[in-house]
Each structure stands twice: as C-alpha cells, then as structure tokens.
Amino acid sequence: MTSRFGHSQHPRRGRSARARAGRREGVQSNFPATQVLERSAHSLPARQRTALVMAGGTGGHIFPGLALAEALRERGWQVHWLGTPGSMEERLVPPRGFAFEPIDFSGVRGKGLKTLLALPLRLARACLQARAVVRRLQPDVVIGLGGYVTFPGGIAARLARKPLLLHEQNSVPGMANKLLSRLATRVYTAFPNVLPDAQWVGNPMRRAFTRQPRPERRLAGREGPLRLLVVGGSLGAKALNDIVPQALAWIHEQDRPIVTHQSGESQIEALRRSYAAAGVEATLTPFIEDTAAAFAEADLVLCRAGASTVTEIAAVGAAAVFVPFPHAVDDHQTTNAQYLVKVGGGWLVQQADLTAHGLAEMLQNMKRQDLLAKAQKARTMRKINATRDIVAACERLAR
C-alpha cells in the first residue's frame, strides 16, 4: 500500500530496501551519508606539493638552496631546480636527486657592450623558457636564492601568480634579488638591514653546523701547536695558496701550527708545489667533506668571506681571519666579514695587506685563550633557524 506521494507505508520494508541498496554500493546502511563522504575523503592520498628552487652561479647561492631543497624533500615535497646548462648547479644538484630544469641565461656584468646590447632578447627568451617550466610543473611555491637564473624564473613565477619567496645570502643584495624583491611574496636575508621589508633569518645550512659543541667545550684542555684550517673554497684562493706556505716557513718548526689547507681541485697541484718549495708539511685537500666538523676541530680558520662561510663560522662558533675576495661584486665580502669582526668575532685582513711576514707574526702571537674568546663572540651572532622558517612559510603558502 502506498501513500498519495508514492512512498511505502511499511517502514520496515522501506529500511530493508535501503539496506539492500547500501550493501550493493558497499556502504553500511546505519552510517549517515556525510560520515561516509568524510571517511572517503580522508582515505585519499594527499596531493604531493611541488617547489621550484632557483639558484646558480656560485656555491654561495647553491648550497643554501640545497639545504632548503633537502628539508622540503624530508617534508614530502617534490623539488625541481631551475638552473643553466654547464653550470656549477648542474654539476651539484642532480647527483643529490633533484630534477634539473635548464634555461639559457647567464650574467652580463663585465661581459662587454655586445653582451649588454643582446640582453633584452636573451632575457625575453629566458623568461619564456622559465614560464614553460612553471606551466608544466605548476609549483606550489617558487624559491629564489640569487644568481642570474633567479630573475627570469622569478618573473615567470609572478606572471603565473605563484608564490615567490626570495632569500638573499649576502650583506649587499645581488642584482636579481634586488629587482625581484618588490614583486616577491616573502623576502628573507642572511644579514640584517639588507632589503626593505625583509625578514632577517640567517642562512639556510645543514644541521651539522648548528649541532657542534660550544667553543668552550671543544677547546677545553687543548695543548700543543695551534690547529689552522685554511679554506680557499670550491675554486681555491690563489693569494692564500701563495702566501700561507711562505708565512709558515717563517715560523720555527716547533712552533708552527698543524695545518689543513683546502684549495679546490684546480689548484691542488700548484698548492703541493708551494708547500714543498717552502719546506712545510701540511694536510692538503681539494675538498672538505664535513666542513662543520673541520671548523669545530680548528683553533683558527683562515678563509675568504663568502656569505655561507661567514654564517657557518658563526653557527659553529670558530675564530677566523677573513681575507675578502677583492673582486667580489660591490665588495660584499668585506661587508660580510664585518658582521662578525665588529663584535670581536674575528679579524679582517684585506688581500692587499696580506704578506707572508705579517701573517707569520700574527700566527705566532695568537693564544688559545684569545681564540676561544673570538669563537664565543662569533657564536653569539649566529642565526640558525633559516631553513625551518622558510620551509614553514612554504607550507603555509601551499595550503
């Protein structure tokens, strides 16, 4: 029997029909429909988020980018890297398991009038190539860390309305980051007061730098010759390679520091000849696998003043003599070094003032207690949460 609306007037028979229908669909009849939908939604796998990292040209841009890329991957992100063919980033990034997206663009400073005149066409082509990468990947965030490749990638990101995060490693901003900072969603810096409306977070770096024991624990009870670490970087520092062996030769053998000297692959043979000619023994290496441990082991570091080097020395808490690269753009290495030197966290010696005799005298006059004080002051300037803060911002923007 049915009502005038055509529904069954026998409730038990009606519920049985619904139950049979539910079983046919694989759904228990005693669950409300909303609960079934919620349970189905929660069982779906979460969409994998994608980040496009842009950094190139030098290790100072690339290694902070790799620290961020690895942290994002640990959080389940898929990370792609925008770079240029035949570059340092193309050599370093793919072996670490990140997809490399090449576009054709390079620097213009010091390349002559012909290169400068061709810039508009080259930039337009690079922007189109970057735009194609962004369209294909549809990244949740785009992260620029400097180098010329960042500029066309940043333009492409904003045209596609993708969140653009910038990080400037140096105390003097590079051209690409300076131009893009007005368009970016978030801007971060490794040093204070670098770009307007930027958040000072420090430099992204591997956890090994932030987990070394404090200087007073590392240096407690040390005796004997000082342990000197000379760091020339990936390309080496010819001035250090030439002067340091001569300086050590001025010091009596019993008083000489125990030296580890890193020079870069291209200069290792010349460095061996320099030490042999000076009659000085040292551990010579083209590359240091664990830089954090090497900084922690040294009583004194003699090095250039790239942004990564300065901020990593601060993170570990190590005494350092900084010799800025004199041809760095806008002399930014001098400004980088002053961040620690101005608080008593190191020494600054311009390359033009660096002599073998002067360096020998400086090393002979150094005492461990003085080096410990420098290391402690350097450590007070460390900012170690950049990776955490930038990754957290990426996750907020990707929701």
Curated annotation (Swiss-Prot):
GO terms for molecular function: UDP-N-acetyl-D-glucosamine:N-acetylmuramoyl-L-alanyl-D-glutamyl-meso-2,6-diaminopimelyl-D-alanyl-D-alanine-diphosphoundecaprenol 4-beta-N-acetylglucosaminlytransferase activity; undecaprenyldiphospho-muramoylpentapeptide beta-N-acetylglucosaminyltransferase activity. Its EC number is 2.4.1.227. Coiled coil: none annotated. Pathway: Cell wall biogenesis; peptidoglycan biosynthesis. Residues 1-31 are annotated as: Disordered. It catalyses: di-trans,octa-cis-undecaprenyl diphospho-N-acetyl-alpha-D-muramoyl-L-alanyl-D-glutamyl-meso-2,6-diaminopimeloyl-D-alanyl-D-alanine + UDP-N-acetyl-alpha-D-glucosamine = di-trans,octa-cis-undecaprenyl diphospho-[N-acetyl-alpha-D-glucosaminyl-(1->4)]-N-acetyl-alpha-D-muramoyl-L-alanyl-D-glutamyl-meso-2,6-diaminopimeloyl-D-alanyl-D-alanine + UDP + H(+). Gene3D superfamilies: Glycogen Phosphorylase B. GO terms for cellular component: plasma membrane. It is found in: Cell inner membrane. It holds the Pfam family Glyco_transf_28. Residues 7-21 have a biased composition (Basic residues). It is a peripheral membrane protein. Its main location: membrane. UDP-N-acetyl-alpha-D-glucosamine binds at T58, G59, G60, N170, R206, S234, I288, Q333. PANTHER family: GLYCOSYLTRANSFERASE, UDP-N-ACETYLGLUCOSAMINE--N-ACETYLMURAMYL-(PENTAPEPTIDE) PYROPHOSPHORYL-UNDECAPRENOL N-ACETYLGLUCOSAMINE TRANSFERASE 1. Cell wall formation. Catalyzes the transfer of a GlcNAc subunit on undecaprenyl-pyrophosphoryl-MurNAc-pentapeptide (lipid intermediate I) to form undecaprenyl-pyrophosphoryl-MurNAc-(pentapeptide)GlcNAc (lipid intermediate II). This is UDP-N-acetylglucosamine--N-acetylmuramyl-(pentapeptide) pyrophosphoryl-undecaprenol N-acetylglucosamine transferase.
